[in-house]
Amino acid sequence: MEAERPQEEDGEQSLPQDDQGWPPVNATARPWRSAPPSPPPPGTRHTALGPRSGSLLSLQTELLLDLVAEAQSRRLEEQRATFHTPEAPPNLAPAPPRLLEDKEQLYSTILSHQCQRIEAQRSDPPLPPGGQELLELLLRVQGGGRMEEQRSRPPTHTC
């Protein structure tokens, strides 16, 4: 069973149609077409425009939507900007190896200064309440000289 195609009423100007009776679709419009409405069920009253008015309205709606889509497409194309990538001038050669050495030296200088700054900002951890008194008591019991003999040097921080 073949779907009913929209038909034009007599007296209206004819639109060009393809081999299946559909109006042509331009390249910028939608790639799909809406299907014509199904015929009304038997016993339904027709409108004053006749039984084919739904098909004509559907066709007109589709043509209107095609025109709107085409107008919006043209408007977007008019607003599109061109992007030109600048080409590198031929007189600029690749960076010499000296520049790389300078960058490495700068990096190591910054790193060493930051390491020294961090070491300068270090502080001793706070002692718990009564901790200082406990340390003084231990010094008296063990003797000051013995404690100094057992002391080791703290490791040096190298960054």
Swiss-Prot record:
Pfam short name (any one): GoLoco
GO cellular component: cytoplasm; plasma membrane
Keywords, comma-separated and alphabetical: Cytoplasm, Phosphoprotein, Repeat
PROSITE patterns (alphabetical): GOLOCO
InterPro entries: GoLoco_motif, GPSM3, TPR-like_helical_dom_sf
Record localization: Cytoplasm
Bias (Pro residues): 34-43, 87-97
Keyword Phosphoprotein found: yes
Modified residues (Phosphothreonine): T61
Domain called GoLoco: residue spans: 61-83, 103-125, 131-154
GO BP annotation list: positive regulation of cytokine production involved in inflammatory response; positive regulation of inflammatory response; positive regulation of leukocyte chemotaxis
Renumbered residue ranges of the record's region Disordered: 1-54, 77-97
Phosphoserine modifications at: S34, S38, S55, S58
GO MF entries: GTPase regulator activity
Protein role: Interacts with subunit of G(i) alpha proteins and regulates the activation of G(i) alpha proteins.
Domain notes: The GoLoco 1 and/or GoLoco 3 domains exhibit GDI activity towards GDP-bound G(i) alpha protein, but not the GoLoco 2 domain.
Protein name, entry field: G-protein-signaling modulator 3
Organism: Mus musculus
